[in-house]
């Protein structure tokens, strides 16, 4: 058995993924285009069906005024917690209406999503992390670093206990927790708690051909974070591989305990490198080494074709 990357072809950059039971859900950036933030569903991580958009009503978010080419909705993150799907993203509008970081939510990803709940924090590439002690954290990229702030959600319920509305307050100061390994533009942060460690996965090098993934970890969510000695842990830079610009990764564990990453990349058709399908969504397997650090893809590289030797659990069971 094999599969061929990309798993979602065409203009679908900045993928983020979550799993609920047997189901995987994925979202992408949509920039100035409406409807915004496409939502996909899959049972096997290979075959994906688009099931809707997070921004589907003009009154949700203004994209017509002050939103030039290549700005708008940046880098959404999707997370699921206690029956609610959350998508956090940034509307970059250069001072236009509805600019800033926001959350939309739903209990049914096939239906409509809420109006945006704006968050008074700067930067781009916002992400949510629900800790096992009930606290919620925001990470974002700002001023050439990755920062964290604590959030507090308040909910309203109907008579059946279903959430009907929510608000979100920032309840701590911002703290820079990592500046990366020295690459340009540290961004795209995601936090995970695995075996007692807080792992901070980010992108560096810019979203062109020097793109790379780096990772750090800490026993305390606020740091200090130690950098992986093998950073960057994932990049196709300076190789002859057909997929270029790999980065902006989110990771997920399947029901068999196997780990996978989704990332963006592009497929140039000429040299100097030019690509006409934009940044696409790719899938890569990963494992953890004896020291507790991820080994992503083929020793940090993304191949176009993955064979059965790379496929574990989820696919070998079929």
For every predicted segment, state its role.
Residues 1-318:
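Carbohydrate-active catalytic/glycan-binding domains of CAZyme proteins
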């Amino acid at each position: 058995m094999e599969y061929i990357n990309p798993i979602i072809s065409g203009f679908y950059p900045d993928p983020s993924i979550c799993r609920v039971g047997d189901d995987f859900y994925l979202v992408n950036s949509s920039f100035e285009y409406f409807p915004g933030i496409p939502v996909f569903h899959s049972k096997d991580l290979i075959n994906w069906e688009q099931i809707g958009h997070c921004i589907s009503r003009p009154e949700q978010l203004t994209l017509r005024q002050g939103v030039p080419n290549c700005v708008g909705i940046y880098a959404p993150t999707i997370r699921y917690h206690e029956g609610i799907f959350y998508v956090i993203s940034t509307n970059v509008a250069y001072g236009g209406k509805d600019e800033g970081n926001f959350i939309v939510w739903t209990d049914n990803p096939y239906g409509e999503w809420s109006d945006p709940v704006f968050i008074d924090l700067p930067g781009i590439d916002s992400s949510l992390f629900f800790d096992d002690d009930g606290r919620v954290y925001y990470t974002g990229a700002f001023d050439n670093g990755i920062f964290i702030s604590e959030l507090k959600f308040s909910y309203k319920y109907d008579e059946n206990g279903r959430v009907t509305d929510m608000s979100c307050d920032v309840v701590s100061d911002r703290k820079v927790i990592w500046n990366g390994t020295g690459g340009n533009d540290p961004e795209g942060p995601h936090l995970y708690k695995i075996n007692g460690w807080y792992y901070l996965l980010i992108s560096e090098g810019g979203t062109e051909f020097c793109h790379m993934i780096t990772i750090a970890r800490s026993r305390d969510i606020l740091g200090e974070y130690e950098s992986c000695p093998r950073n960057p842990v994932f990049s196709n830079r300076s190789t002859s591989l057909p997929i270029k610009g790999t980065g902006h990764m989110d990771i997920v564990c399947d029901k068999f305990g196997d780990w996978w990453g989704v990332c963006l990349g592009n497929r140039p058709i000429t040299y100097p490198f030019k690509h006409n399908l934009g940044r696409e969504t790719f899938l890569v397997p990963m494992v953890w080494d004896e020291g507790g650090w991820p080994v992503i893809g083929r020793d940090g590289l993304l191949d176009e074709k993955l064979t059965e030797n790379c496929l574990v659990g989820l696919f070998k069971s079929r």
